């Protein structure tokens, strides 16, 4: 069976669950979304007829999902991203396709739950991943989860997955000092990034750098900024402050206004825009500030 997944911390959790549950994974394909269709084509060229998909949003790639369903014997999707209401209507009739989508937690939590894995170490690790991936900023382990994510990006995901499975899902003995050093180093970089790469427009903060982005999001949210938008290589990462009283309908309306579609995480969604940077930032600044004013939102 092929495993097709993302390349982030939640994808690592999915790999741990999938590789623990199944011993017949022939190959794992990762995508960072920039090569999404290319990786789908690689999977289509692979002789393995069974595909497990985890932590991938097909909102912009429905044609790719259709190709997989039409050309493989079995396709199973575990995901946590939001989709338009009728997105799966035609696909759910396909006998070789099944999906398990739960937007209340991360994809690795869904895998862990559905696979009924009984291991306390993995359970705790999945909890940490869920806290980070769904941005539970009021959880007591939120900053520990942030540190785990920083450390994760210094590792090879396949090698790390293999190591954790072999070591009963325990992090290396040097994890804490090495991860804390990464945190401390990033904090030293923040002041310079704030001076050169951070611009505020009303309740919106724009960050023109991917370095220390999450740290800046946390800080700006503490300052009661409603939105923080990271922009790098035509990718726009929108992070919504959960301390503001946005309802589910508000968040759906917001994503529709920003992206023209309702998919992705309601508080943390990403889209690509290859048009003029200045014009897009101007559009977002006006749109989001007007959105807050029109609805008379207030931060808690």
PLM regions with names:
Residues 1-44:
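Anionic-ligand anchoring segments at beta-strand to alpha-helix junctions in alpha/beta enzyme folds, i.e.
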Residues 39-43, 62-68, 216-220:
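A short acidic, amphipathic alpha-helical/loop segment
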Residues 49-50, 180-300:
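Gly/His-enriched, cation/cofactor- and phosphate-binding structural elements
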Residues 56-89:
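Active-site cofactor/cluster-binding pocket
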Residues 126-197:
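Hydrophobic, aromatic-enriched interface-forming segments
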Residues 8, 18, 55, 79, ...:
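Divalent metal-coordination and catalytic microenvironments
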Residues 89-157:
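Short alpha-helices
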Residues 11, 82-86, 108:
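Short gly/pro/ser/thr-enriched loop/turn and capping motifs at secondary-structure boundaries
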């Amino acid at each position: 069976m092929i495993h097709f997944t993302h390349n982030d911390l939640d994808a690592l959790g999915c790999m741990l669950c999938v590789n623990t549950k199944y011993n017949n994974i022939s190959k794992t394909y990762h995508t960072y979304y920039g090569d999404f269709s290319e990786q789908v084509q690689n999977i289509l060229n692979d002789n393995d007829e069974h595909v497990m998909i985890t932590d991938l949003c097909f909102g912009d790639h429905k044609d790719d999902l259709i190709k997989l369903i039409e050309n493989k014997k079995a396709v199973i999707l575990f995901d946590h991203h939001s989709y338009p209401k009728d997105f799966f209507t035609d696909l759910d009739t396909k006998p070789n396709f099944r999906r398990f989508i739960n937007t209340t937690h991360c994809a690795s939590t869904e895998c862990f739950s559905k696979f009924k894995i009984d291991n306390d170490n993995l359970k705790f690790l999945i909890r940490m991943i869920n806290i980070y991936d769904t941005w539970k900023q009021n959880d007591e382990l939120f900053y520990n989860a942030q540190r785990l994510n920083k450390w994760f990006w210094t590792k090879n995901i396949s090698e790390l997955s293999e190591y954790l499975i072999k070591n009963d899902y325990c992090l290396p003995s040097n994890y804490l000092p090495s991860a804390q050093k990464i945190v401390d180093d990033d904090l030293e970089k923040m002041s310079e990034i704030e001076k050169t790469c951070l611009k505020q427009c009303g309740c919106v903060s724009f960050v023109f750098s991917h370095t220390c982005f999450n740290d800046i999001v946390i800080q700006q949210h503490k300052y009661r900024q409603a939105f923080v938008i990271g922009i790098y290589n035509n990718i726009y990462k929108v992070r919504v402050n959960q301390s503001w009283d946005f309802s589910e309908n508000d968040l759906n309306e917001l994503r529709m206004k920003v992206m023209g579609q309702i998919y992705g995480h309601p508080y943390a969604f990403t889209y690509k825009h290859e048009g003029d940077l200045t014009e897009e930032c101007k559009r977002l600044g006006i749109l989001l500030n007007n959105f807050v004013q029109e609805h008379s939102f207030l931060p808690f």
